[in-house]
């Protein structure tokens, strides 16, 4: 009892010491998160379970959103501790579900706009991520190979000291990490007023899944002491590296002074006064004497245990029948028993004797088992008779039996093996009640049959004794039967039924017919007899006299049925198929005329040939496939019409495209009918495809393509950076895009004012950052180097910018070639460049960037195709491309004769090219006038991206309209677009305000593809492309964000951009400005501005220096939209079918928002109107 009292005193002293105020100089400071949130045993969102440490509670996280935050005052205490120690030590024991991502700890803003700091265990990547929200960006520091989400208990120790972080898992030291700013910059002193500390709760889908225990912040100690307390013997060596390494010249942040939970009343913590504590110290001195006595007793017990252990270590012995035997010693007890000693255990084994097949066996001296001895006597083979059995009846008459056995293997035996006799013990006393009893069973009877299945029977009598004086009769059956089986009985055969009579041998005059039967009812078996009788039977048939046949003279038409009557008359049936008549006279039917669509009609010709009899269809025309029916009669022709379909090698498998290429069907009029195109991740001519890492359409290695086919078969001169134009100014085999010095003048391109001209002197007279060697206006400042007429003389110094022969000061369209200088509205701006040629508007203001001046822009567009009604050549039929091939002012979409040759479009074999003669030499349905060039633009259909639009033949963004979406303010620069590859590649080089680069080609249905690449690791914002562009307020946009982030300016609306690909429709009531800017940044819907059609649910952001390939399909007629993004050869994101009919087509362009060095390479658009 004294010992227990002393231990209790020690415990109270420890509790008081561990809760002292900072001035008391304690050596430990612990902030247990689960204690701080109130209730360390239970609470919402968590359930108490058994943990790794049995002395402290563990919690299974069921719903982290319900777990309350740490109170503000406690959080403020913790912040003060962080500032005092310039860091912290974070401890946690966890058992995390396998391959999950979960937040251990997070500091989130109270306005729910995001997290400021979080510690996340990323089981999918095998890392521990520290996320810090810094001004203008977010830093994520990942400790690699932190395998925590294994389903097993793990213990982490995270030591953060200013801008350094060191992680320990159990006793293993992981790699260290460096923060962009000291930790005090994140854990500011006023942080508790704007943020709260949460445990296990993270962003969407980032809540912790598993069990947590001992989640604590520790101050006033070192990681070395913590790891040593955990039993990590090597913790000293592990920690010396970080403790002795001064960061940025500062002293170590973790000090030994204690900062714990604040309190004002010491006695409230300890529960004892100082006098009481003093008396406890005196009691402890008495306890010391008791402990010393206890130590002496324990020492004596220890010595006795040692003696007992030494005694047990002696060699084992065995004792048997009073005799001592050594270990492994063997001895014999008698002739049938042997024993041995094994580890102090006596094991004995008896000899097992076999059963002897004789009655005269004896055991020889010294042996254990008996032996049989031979005998020649017939009686010697028998064993002695057994004792008689008890009498079967206890009173009255009964029977007794005895038996003997014969050694038939060694002797011959004669006589019976069983003897039976009657017995009579006493007379039955019939004066008292007696229950009946069964006698012994009789022997089994012989089988009831001699063959097959039968039964055998045995009986017993109720006479042992018999019931008397109303005694109970015997219970049970008096007879017992069981089956017996003999050899199978023979089965005699039996006849089956007769078959029907067969056909008579003649129809008249007496003939014979026959029938038969089988011996199968049953079939003879097991020696049974065969059937008796005949197998077949005959009888006379058709005994009547034969009539006179009038059809023997063939009076009917060949193939018509002839019916003869007994009186010699006859009658003809219908004409055979393919003929018509009365059966006597028949003529051929012209199936081709009677059924005008029996065969394929091509170019107005019914491809059917009549024969006598019948008809046959001609083979399907060239480039068509189908059946070639033939037959007789109108009914056959109507039921078996010929169908010829245009042949499609892409579906019938007759193409020769590479397995890594896609077969694109061009139509049966094209020659060839298909084009092979390598899939994303591959490049080549489609027949041969090779690996293409940067997705710019050029293979990593040279390909052996067909003769003279070098396009996209040569090795990529920049295999890791998209450059679809393969520009190489100095011809050194390294593309300009990845060549640091394109002109070999020893001046790096990023500092060379003429990167493509050798100019080591770098002279720049006009100081426009364009060297004199390559400056198209060397004496006029013009950094943009604009040259409208492409004559080598820049616009800044040209006297005639557009090259129309009219000097600039007298030219009413300085940038547009217009010799006639027509100016209908007399506003000083020529009609060729006037955005309102019929209304006076010298300022040319165009607020919505739709190429229509505000003066004449009414934005009334009933068919939503981007062209207002009074300027739309089909105001009631959507036709965004405004195609009008006969230039009659009526668009092709609503013109029944597009080429004005007098042949309606539905019968014109050249719909866009005048050919009133409709000449078609090869009969393929395509007129000679438009053979292989349907729109007559001198570009073969196989190479024409829009074969039905004369105005569009190739992808070209060399001319584009720059559209700022936030034109006011100077927070960032305007986009800077660099054009390459004849307009098929554009690069945006600066961090800029939101803006578009929109081409001038207009489309209805379109496919748009290209390669997306970010060539920098700076920034993480938006880039993408637009389609269906009609104005700066009306367009579709596909935009991609790398990481989730709130826009820095919350006015006029808060904007939260989530990582991942988005498809949005812009229909802004305000147009470009801060409202549209914030709405574009925001992932979601903003009324009156932007509506999100789809966002990637996996929130996958783009990666730096990684090539992606996009494919857009837009069909305005049905509203179908689909965006697919490839990463290498695999699909990374797929929107699936989206349906939206807001806009019926428009222009294509590119989009950037606060993101630099965006490459749009190998771009390609194709019309899909037909």
Curated annotation (Swiss-Prot):
Q: Which domain of life is it from?
A: Eukaryota
What cellular component terms from Gene Ontology apply here?
cell surface; collagen-containing extracellular matrix; endoplasmic reticulum; extracellular matrix; extracellular region; extracellular space; sarcoplasmic reticulum
What the entry lists under InterPro entries is as follows:
ConA-like_dom_sf, EGF-like_Ca-bd_dom, EGF-like_dom, Laminin_G, Thrombospondin_3-like_rpt, Thrombospondin_3_rpt, Thrombospondin_C, TSP1_rpt
Where do the TSP type-1 domain residues begin and end? 379-429, 435-490, 492-547
Domain TSP C-terminal, by residue range, is 958-1170
**UniProt-annotated stretches for the region Involved in retention in extracellular matrix (ECM):** 531-1152
Keywords for the protein's UniProt record, in alphabetical order: Angiogenesis, Apoptosis, Calcium, Cell adhesion, Disulfide bond, EGF-like domain, Endoplasmic reticulum, Extracellular matrix, Glycoprotein, Heparin-binding, Inflammatory response, Repeat, Sarcoplasmic reticulum, Secreted, Signal, Unfolded protein response
For this chain's UniProt record, which GO biological process terms are given?
Answer: angiogenesis; apoptotic process; behavioral response to pain; blood vessel morphogenesis; cellular response to nitric oxide; endocardial cushion development; growth plate cartilage development; inflammatory response
Q: What happens when the gene is disrupted?
A: Knockout enhances eNOS-dependent arterial relaxation in blood vessels. Treating the endothelial lining with THBS1 inhibits ACh-stimulated vasorelaxation. Mean arterial pressure (MAP) is significantly decreased following ACh treatment. Enhanced survival of full-thickness skin grafts, with increased numbers of functional vessels in wound beds. Significant increase in proliferating cell nuclear antigen (PCNA) in middle-aged (8- to 10-month-old) lungs.
Task: Kindly summarize what the UniProt induction comment says about this protein's expression.
Answer: Expression increases in lungs following short-term hypoxia. Expression increases in kidney podocytes in response to elevated free fatty acids. Expression in vasculature, including arteries, increases in normal aging. Expression increases in adipose tissue in diet-induced obesity.
Which residues are in the Laminin G-like domain?
56-270
Pfam family of this protein, just one? Laminin_G_2
Q: Which residues form the EGF-like domain?
A: 547-587, 646-690
- List the disulfide bonds in this chain: 171-232, 391-423, 395-428, 406-413, 447-484, 451-489, 462-474, 504-541, 508-546, 519-531, 551-562, 556-572, 575-586, 592-608, 599-617, 620-644, 650-663, 657-676, 678-689, 705-713, 718-738, 754-774, 777-797, 813-833, 836-856, 874-894, 910-930, 946-1167
Function in brief: Adhesive glycoprotein that mediates cell-to-cell and cell-to-matrix interactions. Multifunctional, involved in inflammation, angiogenesis, wound healing, reactive oxygen species (ROS) signaling, nitrous oxide (NO) signaling, apoptosis, senescence, aging, cellular self-renewal, stemness, and cardiovascular and metabolic homeostasis. Negatively modulates dendritic cell activation and cytokine release, as part of an autocrine feedback loop, contributing to the resolution of inflammation and immune homeostasis. Ligand for receptor CD47.
Q: What is this protein called?
A: Thrombospondin-1
Q: Which organism is it from?
A: Mus musculus
Q: Which gene encodes it?
A: Thbs1
């Amino acid at each position: 009892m004294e010992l227990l009292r002393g231990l209790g005193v020690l415990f109270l002293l420890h509790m008081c010491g561990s809760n002292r105020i900072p001035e008391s100089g304690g050596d430990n400071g612990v902030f247990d998160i689960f204690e701080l949130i109130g209730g360390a045993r239970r609470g919402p969102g968590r359930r108490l379970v058994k943990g790794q440490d049995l002395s402290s509670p563990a919690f299974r996280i069921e719903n982290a959103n319900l777990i309350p935050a740490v109170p503000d005052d406690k959080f403020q205490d913790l912040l003060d501790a962080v500032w005092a120690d310039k860091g912290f030590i974070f401890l946690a024991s966890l058992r995390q579900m396998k391959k999950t991502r979960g937040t251990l700890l997070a500091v989130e803003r109270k306005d729910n706009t995001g997290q400021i700091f979080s510690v996340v265990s990323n089981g999918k990547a095998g890392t521990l991520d520290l996320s810090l929200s810094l001004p203008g960006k977010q830093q994520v520091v990942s400790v690699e190979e932190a395998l925590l989400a294994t389903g097993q208990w793990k213990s982490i120790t995270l030591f953060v000291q200013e801008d350094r972080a060191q992680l320990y898992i159990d006793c293993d030291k992981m790699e260290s990490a460096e923060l962009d700013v000291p930790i005090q910059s994140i854990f500011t002193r006023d942080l508790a007023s704007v943020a709260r500390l949460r445990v296990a709760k993270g962003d969407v889908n980032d809540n912790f899944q598993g069990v947590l225990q001992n989640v604590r912040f520790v101050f006033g100690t070192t990681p070395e002491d913590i790891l040593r307390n955990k039993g990590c013997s090597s913790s000293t060596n592990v920690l010396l590296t970080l403790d002795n390494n001064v960061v940025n010249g500062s002293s170590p942040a973790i000090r030994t002074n204690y900062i714990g939970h604040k309190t004002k009343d010491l006695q409230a913590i300890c529960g004892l006064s100082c006098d009481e504590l003093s008396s406890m110290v005196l009691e402890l001195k008495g306890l010391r004497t008791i402990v010393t006595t206890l130590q002496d007793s324990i020492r004596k017990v220890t010595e006795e245990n040692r003696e007992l252990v030494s005694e047990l270590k002696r060699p084992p012995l065995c004792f048997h029948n009073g005799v001592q035997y050594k270990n492994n010693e063997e001895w014999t007890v008698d002739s049938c028993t042997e024993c041995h000693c094994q580890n102090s255990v006596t094991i004995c084994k008896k000899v097992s004797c076999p059963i002897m097949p004789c009655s005269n066996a004896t055991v020889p001296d010294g042996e254990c088992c008996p032996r049989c001895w031979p005998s020649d006597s017939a009686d010697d083979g028998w064993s002695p008779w057994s004792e008689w059995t008890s009498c079967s009846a206890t009173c009255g008459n009964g029977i007794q039996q005895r038996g003997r056995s014969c050694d038939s293997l060694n002797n011959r035996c004669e006589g019976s093996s069983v003897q039976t006799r009657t017995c009579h013990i006493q007379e039955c006393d019939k004066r008292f009640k007696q229950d009946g009893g069964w006698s012994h069973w009789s022997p089994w009877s012989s089988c009831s049959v001699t063959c097959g299945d039968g039964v055998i029977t045995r009986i017993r009598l109720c006479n042992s004794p018999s019931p008397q004086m109303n005694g109970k009769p015997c219970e049970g059956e008096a007879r017992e039967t069981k089956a017996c089986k003999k050899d199978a009985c023979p089965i005699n055969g039996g006849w089956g039924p007769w078959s029907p009579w067969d056909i008579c041998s003649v129809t008249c005059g007496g003939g014979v017919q026959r029938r038969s039967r089988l011996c199968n009812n049953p079939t003879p078996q097991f020696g049974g007899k065969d059937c008796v009788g005949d197998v077949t039977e005959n009888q006379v048939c058709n005994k009547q006299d034969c009539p006179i046949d009038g059809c023997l003279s063939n009076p009917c038409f060949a193939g018509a049925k002839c019916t003869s009557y007994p009186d010699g008359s006859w009658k003809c049936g219908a004409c055979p198929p393919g003929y018509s008549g009365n059966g006597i006279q028949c003529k051929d039917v012209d199936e081709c005329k009677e059924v005008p669509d029996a065969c394929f009609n091509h170019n107005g010709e019914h491809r059917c040939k009549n024969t006598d009899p019948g008809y046959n269809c001609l083979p399907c025309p060239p480039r068509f496939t189908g059946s070639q029916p033939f037959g007789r009669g109108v009914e056959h022709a109507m039921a078996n019409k010929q169908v010829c379909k245009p042949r499609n090698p892409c579906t019938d498998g007759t193409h020769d495209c590479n397995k890594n290429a896609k077969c694109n069907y061009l139509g049966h009029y094209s020659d060839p009918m298909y084009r092979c195109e390598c899939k994303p991740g591959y490049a080549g001519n489609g027949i041969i495809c090779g690996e293409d890492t940067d997705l710019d359409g050029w293979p990593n290695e040279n390909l052996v393509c067909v003769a003279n086919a070098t396009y996209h078969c040569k090795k990529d001169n920049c295999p890791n950076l998209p450059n679809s134009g393969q520009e190489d100014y100095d011809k050194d085999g390294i593309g300009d895009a990845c060549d640091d010095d394109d002109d070999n003048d020893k001046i790096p391109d990023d500092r060379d004012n003429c990167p493509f001209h050798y100019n080591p002197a770098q002279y720049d007279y006009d100081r426009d950052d364009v060297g004199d060697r390559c400056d198209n206006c060397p004496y006029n400042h013009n950094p943009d180097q604009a040259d409208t007429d492409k004559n080598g003389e820049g616009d800044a110094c040209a006297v005639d910018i557009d090259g129309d022969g009219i000097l600039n000061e007298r030219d009413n369209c300085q940038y547009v070639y217009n010799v006639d200088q027509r100016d209908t509205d007399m506003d000083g701006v020529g009609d060729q460049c006037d955005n309102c040629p019929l209304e006076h508007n010298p300022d040319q203001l165009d607020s919505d960037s739709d190429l229509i001046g505000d003066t004449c822009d009414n934005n009334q567009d009933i068919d939503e195709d981007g062209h207002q009604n009074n300027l739309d050549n089909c105001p009631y039929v959507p036709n965004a491309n405004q195609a009008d091939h006969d230039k009659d002012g009526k668009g092709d979409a609503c013109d029944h004769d597009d080429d004005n040759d007098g042949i309606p479009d539905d019968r014109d074999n050249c719909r866009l090219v005048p050919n009133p003669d409709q000449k078609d030499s090869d009969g393929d349905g395509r007129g000679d006038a438009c053979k292989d060039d349907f729109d007559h633009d001198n570009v073969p259909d196989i190479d024409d991206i829009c074969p039905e639009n004369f105005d569009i033949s190739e992808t070209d963004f060399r001319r584009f309209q720059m559209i700022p979406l936030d034109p006011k303010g100077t927070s960032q620069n305007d986009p800077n677009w660099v054009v390459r590859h004849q307009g098929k590649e554009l690069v945006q080089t600066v961090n800029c305000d939101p803006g578009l680069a929109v081409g001038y080609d207009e489309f209805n249905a379109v496919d748009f593809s290209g390669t997306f690449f970010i060539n920098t690791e700076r920034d993480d914002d938006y880039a993408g492309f637009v389609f269906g562009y009609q104005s700066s307020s009306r367009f579709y946009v596909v935009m991609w964000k790398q990481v989730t982030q709130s826009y820095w300016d919350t006015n006029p609306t808060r904007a939260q951009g989530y990582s991942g690909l988005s498809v949005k429709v812009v229909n802004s009531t305000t147009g470009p400005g801060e409202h549209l800017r914030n709405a574009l940044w925001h992932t979601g819907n903003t009324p009156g501005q932007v509506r999100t059609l789809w966002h990637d649910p996996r929130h996958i952001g783009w990666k730096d220096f990684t090539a992606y390939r996009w494919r857009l399909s837009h069909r305005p007629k049905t509203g179908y939209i689909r965006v697919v993004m490839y990463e290498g050869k695999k699909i990374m994101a797929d929107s699936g079918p989206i349906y939206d009919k807001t806009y019926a087509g428009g222009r294509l362009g590119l989009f950037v928002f606060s993101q630099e060095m965006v490459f749009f390479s190998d771009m390609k658009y194709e019309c899909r109107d037909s």
